[in-house]
Structures are given as structure tokens and as C-alpha cells.
């Protein structure tokens, strides 16, 4: 009979140990370490897109046009929001136009059409003229750099 008592005692001790271990794990957390807090994983969802800040560029344009004038922080915030809002609207319209034409790339053609849809008439004229000038300057600069690189050859640039 003594062996039976040992089995009962061993079974009771094992049950008590299992209960204590389960209680310890519940108190400690999923990893089983008591007293250590593990950080929760961030929820996966839409990433917040940071808004661009155009303050520096707005100030540069202001000093070019009217160097004697300043701008308050509230006015700067309004101008920044205006620029961000217009860029977002133009980008949205350009992406819709690219989808209509079944293209994955937004080209100059889609951007021009989007600007025509978003901006009023007089702003459209200025934007169209200055945009054409900027594209022309960019293309002429890149063609100059490419032609200089070809004349000198590879590895011989100084």
C-alpha cells in the first residue's frame, strides 16, 4: 500500500505545480516571464503620410517678390496648407486621368490636364507657362550634361 500513497502524493504535487505554473503564466504574460512587460506590436493599418512643409520656399518667393515684407506664422500656416491642398488635388486628378488612359505612370500630359481641371483660368495660364519653362530648362540642362559626358568619355571627367 505505501506505493499507492506515493502515487497519490506525486499526482497531487504535480497538479499543484501545474496549477501554480498556470497561475504564474497568467500573471506574467504570454512569454512566461514574471515582472517583465513586453511592448505590444503596433497595429497594421494605413500609414499616415507626412505632409510636406513649403515654408522655406514660400519665404524665398516672398523675399524675391517683396523683400521688405514679412509674414506671420498664422499666415505661413495658411499658405502652406493652400499649397499642400492644391498639390494633393492635382495629384489626385492626374492619377485618375492616368487610370482612364490605362497607364501606370503619370506623365506631363496628365499633369497638364489635371492642372487645367483644378486651377482657375488666370492661375492656369501662369502655371502652364512657368511649368513649360521649367521643363524646358530641365531638359536643356540634362542634355548639356549628357553631351559633355559623351565628349570626354567615361572616366575622363575632371
From Swiss-Prot:
Residues 147-158 have a biased composition (Basic residues). It is found in: Nucleus; Chromosome. Belongs to the histone H2B family. It holds the Pfam family Histone. Residues 135-144 have a biased composition (Basic and acidic residues). Expressed in the generative cell within the bicellular pollen. Not detected in other reproductive or vegetative tissues. SMART domains: H2B. Can be acetylated to form H2BK6ac and H2BK33ac. The keyword Nucleus applies. This is Histone H2B.1. The keyword Nucleus applies. Core component of nucleosome. Nucleosomes wrap and compact DNA into chromatin, limiting DNA accessibility to the cellular machineries which require DNA as a template. Histones thereby play a central role in transcription regulation, DNA repair, DNA replication and chromosomal stability. DNA accessibility is regulated via a complex set of post-translational modifications of histones, also called histone code, and nucleosome remodeling. Keywords: Acetylation, Chromosome, DNA-binding, Nucleosome core, Nucleus. PANTHER family: HISTONE H2B. The modification N6-acetyllysine is found at residues 7, 25. Residues 26-45, 135-158 are annotated as: Disordered. One of its GO terms (molecular function) is structural constituent of chromatin. Coiled coil: none annotated. GO terms for cellular component: nucleosome; nucleus. The nucleosome is a histone octamer containing two molecules each of H2A, H2B, H3 and H4 assembled in one H3-H4 heterotetramer and two H2A-H2B heterodimers. The octamer wraps approximately 147 bp of DNA. SUPFAM superfamilies: Histone-fold. It comes from the Eukaryota.
Amino acid at each position: 500500500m505505501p506505493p499507492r500513497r506515493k502515487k497519490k502524493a506525486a499526482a497531487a504535487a504535480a497538479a499543484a505545480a501545474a496549477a501554480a505554473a498556470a497561475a504564474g503564466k497568467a500573471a506574467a504574460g504570454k512569454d512566461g516571464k514574471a515582472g517583465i512587460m513586453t511592448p505590444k506590436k503596433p497595429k497594421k493599418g494605413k500609414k499616415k503620410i507626412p505632409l510636406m512643409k513649403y515654408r522655406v520656399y514660400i519665404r524665398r518667393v516672398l523675399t524675391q517678390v517683396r523683400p521688405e515684407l514679412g509674414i506671420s506664422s498664422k499666415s505661413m500656416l495658411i499658405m502652406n496648407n493652400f499649397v499642400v491642398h492644391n498639390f494633393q488635388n492635382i495629384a489626385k486628378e492626374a492619377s485618375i486621368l492616368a487610370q482612364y488612359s490605362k497607364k501606370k505612370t503619370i506623365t506631363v500630359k496628365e499633369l497638364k490636364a489635371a492642372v487645367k481641371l483644378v486651377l482657375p483660368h488666370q492661375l492656369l495660364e501662369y502655371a502652364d507657362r512657368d511649368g513649360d519653362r521649367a521643363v524646358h530648362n530641365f531638359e536643356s540642362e540634362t542634355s548639356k550634361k549628357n553631351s559633355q559626358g559623351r565628349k570626354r568619355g567615361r572616366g575622363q571627367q575632371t
